[in-house]
Regions:
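Conserved active-site motif detector
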Residues: 2-204
């Protein structure tokens, strides 16, 4: 998701890039660090896809909806706003997320934060991700869809990056509540306004 779907290093041939899938779970950080070492100096194309399990999406959504923490989701009613940057580059993704509807017509969405360990431009980058129920769920497809709606601003991300990783190492995830805006004639550009719903990390 986000830059993780892109190629990390320039290709020397026109061959299709190798795709690695990494599950976003308690072993995710170790796996990503191993990939970082593996990719160092590698000339061939390699793309990384992050798979967010339905069970985790369910846990986060349930914690948000019920206002109750769980073993993996340290929920609280803190509702601390965080800056979201990069939305202007994700307008098509945000439009798809809203199903071409106005952002204000969307319900509040659940979401989470994901540090981007392999980001070649900013090692402290933290992605902001929203969770929705798949529009056409089938037995062979996932119940939930995850979409990246932006990034934390650099200064804020640098302060909490390591703390988020420490939580992930304990198989705990930072829950978000996200309000969508835009998608109208008066305000065509979509926006996503995230609020952190945990007191395990200080974001203020």
């Amino acid at each position: 998701m986000g830059f993780l779907k892109k190629v990390f290093q320039a290709a020397t041939t026109a061959t299709q890039p190798e795709v690695r899938t990494v599950v976003f779970d308690q072993d995710w950080q170790d796996t990503m660090e191993m990939l970082r070492t593996e990719f160092a100096g590698k000339k061939s194309q390699t793309s990384v896809h992050i798979d967010v399990p339905d069970a985790l999406c369910e846990d986060i959504s349930t914690a948000i909806d019920s206002h109750e923490p769980s073993a993996r989701v340290p929920y609280s009613d803190s509702k601390v706003p965080i800056n979201n940057v990069g939305e202007s580059f994700r307008q098509e993704d945000l439009r798809e997320l809203c199903g071409n509807a106005a952002g204000e017509d969307m319900p509040w969405l659940s979401g989470f934060l994901m540090p981007e360990i392999l980001n070649p431009y900013d090692k402290y980058a933290v992605g902001i991700h929203a969770i929705t129920i798949s529009s056409t769920p089938e037995p062979s497809t996932k119940k939930f869809t995850v979409a990246q709606v932006g990034y934390m601003d650099k200064e804020s991300a640098k302060k909490v990056h390591k703390k988020i990783l420490n939580l992930l190492g304990k198989d705990q995830y930072v829950p978000l509540l996200i309000r969508m805006t835009g998608g109208t004639k008066e305000k065509p550009n979509y926006g996503a306004f995230p609020y952190v719903m945990t007191d395990k990390i200080k974001f203020e």
